[in-house]
Amino acid sequence: MLKNINPTQTQAWKALTAHFESAQDMDLKALFAQDSERFAKYSARFGQDILVDYSKNLVNAETMQHLFALAKETDLQSAITAMFKGEAINQTEDRAVLHTALRNRSNSPVLVNGEDVMPAVNAVLAKMKAFSERVIGGEWKGFTGKAITDVVNIGIGGSDLGPYMVTEALVPYKNHLTMHFVSNVDGTHMAETLKNVDPETTLFLVASKTFTTQETMTNAHTARDWFLKAAGDEAHVAKHFAALSTNGKAVAEFGIDTDNMFEFWDWVGGRYSLWSAIGLSIILSIGYDNFVELLAGAHEMDQHFVNTPFESNIPVILALIGIWYNNFHGAESEAILPYDQYLHRFAAYFQQGNMESNGKYVDRDGNPVTYQTGPIIWGEPGTNGQHAFYQLIHQGTKLIPCDFIAPAVSHNLVGDHHQKLMSNFFAQTEALAFGKSAQAVQAELEKAGKSAAEIAALVPFKVFEGNRPTNSILVKQITPRTLGNLIAMYEHKIFVQGVIWNIFSFDQWGVELGKQLANQILPELADSAAVTSHDSSTNGLINAFKAFRA
């Protein structure tokens, strides 16, 4: 059980509130000028391959001291221990939270209700290994005797976002199989995917724990119907469909051999499920050995998180700095900006990871909170974002803390592309931190031969205030192991913030109401009769929809 501690009632929170009165005037230029060792003091290395520089943040030693005190006063250490021990910290669903067990490469026992889950975890891994080797090696044949060339993962939310992000991030490690991901119940998503695959050589993975998820099962049945138009015999379904599920009865009724059903457990949350059987598409894309490297990387970060004092603990530090901006500076969003095209889905993945976890307005006592909880998460790869939204980050009126992520070594050594990419990576955090003064702008314009009148008119528009905070996360190279490090780092950051905010991070009741109402509305769309059972707006929209289709 997690303790119920209102963070605003702690001494540390009160100290941070008082500290903010002077800290809101903090100036990064001055902080660096005052301390030549600032980078060394406010950066951390993870192993040999990751450097996290948090020196360009609006914090000093006193800020960090109070933030670490907040972590201790809200009993973060007990919460970490409870999660890793398999206690039911997802209290509203009475479930343990053990995605960490899925990547427990030490194989030390992890108990849920007194039973070690590791034998079951290892059994599913072994089953996925054997299955994937048959498919990748060409031993698995389709209904006409041809080997599989394409894999279509049908899922939504955690059954889609994680595997899609990872397979894209690790394209340099992929084999000959072509991966496709279908999530949206909009028929266009499935229709466009099916245009590009051959029923004789396509394997579908249906990812739904209950095998009842509306979007996933709608898409799965559409894929099955399309397949049977070519194959004819329903017995052939078993050669082209596998299930990531626990509902053996429904899987068998669909036509899938339950030998090709890969299970996971109720202690695996959807947005943390890529480490489970939901990761089968990852294994089919990059091979089992690389998937194990991904698990190993995450396990390394788990060990760091569990065993490192808060003052040197990377996920804890990042979480606390995020709380400083969210709850004291009034920042409403955070941007994740990977300078690596392979990571183009990384921000979208953690948009779900963060916003579904910490988008809560009720505390662990069931009372509305009186403080801000989860931030809005967004982002795009650099340098694309520089030509889209960085304008607002640099010169807008909103404070947007940013995480910049980049590899030192590219997988594609094309001319001087990577040096140009990285020059932008380094330049952006420098520009955001230190800006450009009116004097510097004036000197620049004078050098360009502008008149005094032109200079006076232009200067205000060309000044950069700076003092925009950033973290820089430099990775030697994006590999399965370092990607595992990064994903687990952000997972634990989110967990830490939820603990301190006194909310439950592992349920997601906010997705339920819309689904319930959609199930009520669906039969109302079956005919042309006018609808009157809702509010005037919803009635008007449904009736306009029907009129457009008449």
UniProtKB/Swiss-Prot annotation:
Query: Which chemical reaction does it catalyze?
Result: alpha-D-glucose 6-phosphate = beta-D-fructose 6-phosphate
Question: Pfam families from the entry?
Answer: PGI
- Pathway assigned to this chain's UniProt record: Carbohydrate biosynthesis; gluconeogenesis; Carbohydrate degradation; glycolysis; D-glyceraldehyde 3-phosphate and glycerone phosphate from D-glucose: step 2/4
The protein's UniProt keywords, in alphabetical order, are: Cytoplasm, Gluconeogenesis, Glycolysis, Isomerase
Tell me which CDD domains the record gives.
SIS_PGI_1, SIS_PGI_2
- List its EC numbers: 5.3.1.9
- Domain of life, per UniProt, equals Bacteria
UniProt-annotated catalytic positions: E356, H387, K515
Q: Does the keyword Cytoplasm apply?
A: yes
Annotated GO CC locations: cytosol
Show the Gene3D superfamilies listed in the entry: 1.10.1390.10, Glucose-6-phosphate isomerase like protein, domain 1 (3.40.50.10490)
Q: Name one GO molecular function term.
A: carbohydrate derivative binding
Q: Name one GO biological process term.
A: glycolytic process
The residues the entry assigns to the signal sequence are: none
| Subcellular location(s) per record | Cytoplasm
Principal location class: cytoplasm
From the UniProt record, list the coiled-coil ranges: none
Chaperone recorded as keyword: no
State the family named in the UniProt similarity comment for this chain.
Belongs to the GPI family.
Please explain the role this protein plays, according to its UniProt record: Catalyzes the reversible isomerization of glucose-6-phosphate to fructose-6-phosphate.
NCBIfam families given in the database record: PRK00179.1
Question: What is the recorded name of this protein?
Answer: Glucose-6-phosphate isomerase
